[in-house]
Amino acid sequence: METESTGTPTGETRLALVRRARRIDRILAETYPYAVAELDFETPFELLVATVLSAQTTDVRVNAATPALFARFPDAHAMAAATEPELQELVRSTGFYRNKASAILRLSQELVGRHDGEVPARLEDLVALPGVGRKTAFVVLGNAFGQPGITVDTHFGRLARRLGFTDETDPGKGRARRGRPVPPARDWTMLSHRLIFHGRRVCHARRPACGRCPIARWCPSYAAGETDPERARALLAYELKPGREELLELLRAGRTAGAAGPRPRAGGXAPGLPAQPFR
């Protein structure tokens, strides 16, 4: 619980929390240099639609469905003229396809009617769109426009609590907590990617692989899961999504996501987005 004297959930001083968070981010950046947006996209519109489709499913399933979807309806103008049955068939594999087809149709129509078919680059405009909440808006702002934003999904929220960055269980309240965020705003997007990636691979909800965690030394929740290194190894569940191996090789060679250049349906980092951990 956050205290009046320290202002942090762990009871450590604010300065100690900031230093620990910086160390954690540096280690995660070194461990996962390829942690970027997992949804494939080429335009802000594609990312917006893909993020809406990602609800209650995996990014892998969305990435399998979107090439055909965007080949037929490449922008808001084209999708706004689609019928719901057409969209339902194309997004069926993502689950809840009737609701999702309706959502992306209304979203496209609103973009055409209010923004001339362009995705707005302001938070207040994004959240005013049908089916777009703050999480989706921050994904788009951070990855399509290079504007800082923390993507609070289930992985990020779980890790933020385990690491003692917050004690809130409600993501909406977590944004409004007293005091300034631990990382500076410019680093929010990349920190989100790293924590989400770490949550998928190591820090699982039910049984985290503590014995294989690169930040175990700085985690106040160490021993919440399996601490034996060999047994923890068997729990590691995530490495790279299919098709990202070439990016890993480039990054290991010292090149950034931007240096890799565009590739078909690539998410990657937005132009100008910092690839280094905050300091």
UniProtKB/Swiss-Prot annotation:
Listed CDD domains: ENDO3c
Domain HhH: 123-142
Cofactor, free-text remark: Binds 1 [4Fe-4S] cluster.
Region: Disordered, residue numbers: 256-279
Superkingdom of origin organism: Bacteria
One Pfam family hit: HhH-GPD
Any one GO molecular function term: DNA-(apurinic or apyrimidinic site) endonuclease activity
Cofactors: [4Fe-4S] cluster
Function per UniProt: DNA repair enzyme that has both DNA N-glycosylase activity and AP-lyase activity. Initiates repair at cis-syn pyrimidine dimers. Proceeds via an imino enzyme:DNA intermediate.
Protein's name according to its UniProt entry: Ultraviolet N-glycosylase/AP lyase
The species this protein was found in: Micrococcus luteus (strain ATCC 4698 / DSM 20030 / JCM 1464 / CCM 169 / CCUG 5858 / IAM 1056 / NBRC 3333 / NCIMB 9278 / NCTC 2665 / VKM Ac-2230) (Micrococcus lysodeikticus)
